């Protein structure tokens, strides 16, 4: 016979294991913890004892003091308790099956009708003493109850249950899936016991309470509420196969069903199952039991777990370390404050924030003063700062060898920078450039006297400021080219400022000396105003007159460059891992993302793993400036790398790392940081900016998609287009990218109203053109940045409100006012200047002040209608909607001309 654990009984009944252990100990069982096991018979006794509160007969003999204790608390029910106890101890002979069925069918109707009355009386029997009237009514019933029990109890081994047990039968019943191991003979014996006991219980109860006073029960129900203890059992687990209603039916279905029970039935204790059932035996105090089973089983409210109090709140925070980029809720956690406190402080200062917004340095400083906290800002980018990690790793000064100098050529547009480089390289790059101007950054290698020199050619157009700044940032020496016939121009001044900011030596090349209009002194004077003094004037800057066309002075220029490089003592460690700067990047068909780089330290080889910002990868191939393959690039040299995961941003630092995993982690952390930073910008708004954002919503926008051949040109285009804005219109760049125009670009443009695709140095394919035509999308491509900017300006001008310009037509003096019936006042005028035209707008001027502005309704000379009246002639003028005309007033005639606005 298998045993059942106390914990399983507790789970089945929905009671704590501790209470079940105590009940088992009250029955005299040797149980100490919930893990102890008892037999099925003992488990059945515990189950019955917990439900009814009455100790079974078998265990009552071992512990006889349990019942007298209950009787002592209920002195008013002494006689009834004795009768019931006596009835339970008797062992009458078994009644016949026919007698049980007849008794049950005869009594069941009346039993159901009195269920509520019996439930109330059961509660009163347990809770409060009965009055005299109750005793008198119950005494004859007790005698009858006793005789009925002696005659009809059919199961000698089954102890008689109390009135409380019987009232429990009205609860909802639960049919539980049976297990095969328990479908044995003991269950069948229980079925027979249920059948015999049902008839006894129903018959005896009917005789006991047939003539009870309903008014007394109703009165007592009003006097005192039912005790909560009687509500513990909201449902019973019963074996319907043992019910007399289903005695002849065999049910083999194992499904679990829940049904309401409207009859009195004695429960057959089921073997304990491990499956945890819903806790329906222990409802909360406020829950009520539905006697008709409507609405199913009531569920207890989930207990709310109390959050552990944060002990740190009581501790005063005096100093915190925070990253440079920190959100409001993160700052609140550092201070042991609620985010609402931080948001409230910022709101009082006029800043509207949410808990996910980043705090700037000013806000952090203000909050630190408000909360009296010392704030130390740390660099949170260290975890993905691969450049700093490289610098720490490569610190030794050993293995340093001279490297090639990096020279950047800068200057104003059309001053001959690329032509100078073409002569040095013996090439013709300038001839192949669109519009004759440089629009990309180029890096080239030149060998002079057995020494390599790396040249960087930068654009001179104003749109390429960022390109020039990048060129100056990675260079060792800057050559500023100035045309001798043009002098110092705006981009010349900008180039000087970039070079000074980079702290690099400057060499001035005075170009176009072969022209007759060349004036080198003009160049020297202009640069002297920028503190660039030539050596012959007592300064420290070399001025070299050259001609990129004839080659005059170019050898002298290269000699000065090499001499300056020797003075700088440029050295690097070729044995270290590579460190390089990305000068330009693009997307090439068949190669994918490519980048033009200049190696600053170490040696870059094919197969190296590198990371550059959010791009990483293993180098598949290296190319020189003429497209020839290389195996390695040494310090100070330039080249093109192939193999990055995506287009590297121009200006990024490229570092060689040991493993692909390390490179991927750096790139992903950097990408996540940039994404979070971008998201935070979109949520920030202050009170001062709120009105500006509302007004911005009223701006007219020109949506564009910008595609360019290289990243540097794309950056320059975006910067130039964003500048084309005023208080009425602006350019909205909805997408930009490097590479050709794709079908997704056309689809995006078609989804945006009036969107234009702008391509720079790229051409769409025939398929793309056809799809754009079908979608009604306009594609415009350019090779020169001037033309692109001018066209966008024209488009913006068409969207702007037209300019209204007035053109004066003439003036007339009112000599006499004539009142015409049904028409109004007519001004008799003499035209003193120009002409007065019918249909034109006029102003009525009195004493130099405009008193009315409207249209000419009629214009007559004598009796004839005329279109216009010239100077020196008299006429009659009717003004539409105006009768307040006086003598000596002036009438001024004009027309409005609309002109397209220009940006």
Curated annotation (Swiss-Prot):
Compositional bias ranges of the Low complexity kind: 267-278
Basic and acidic residues biased stretches: 69-163
Major subcellular location class: cytoplasm
Residue ranges of the region described as G4: 511-514
GO molecular function, one term: GTP binding
HAMAP family xref list: IF_2_B (MF_00100_B)
Name of the featured protein: Translation initiation factor IF-2
Organism: Campylobacter curvus (strain 525.92)
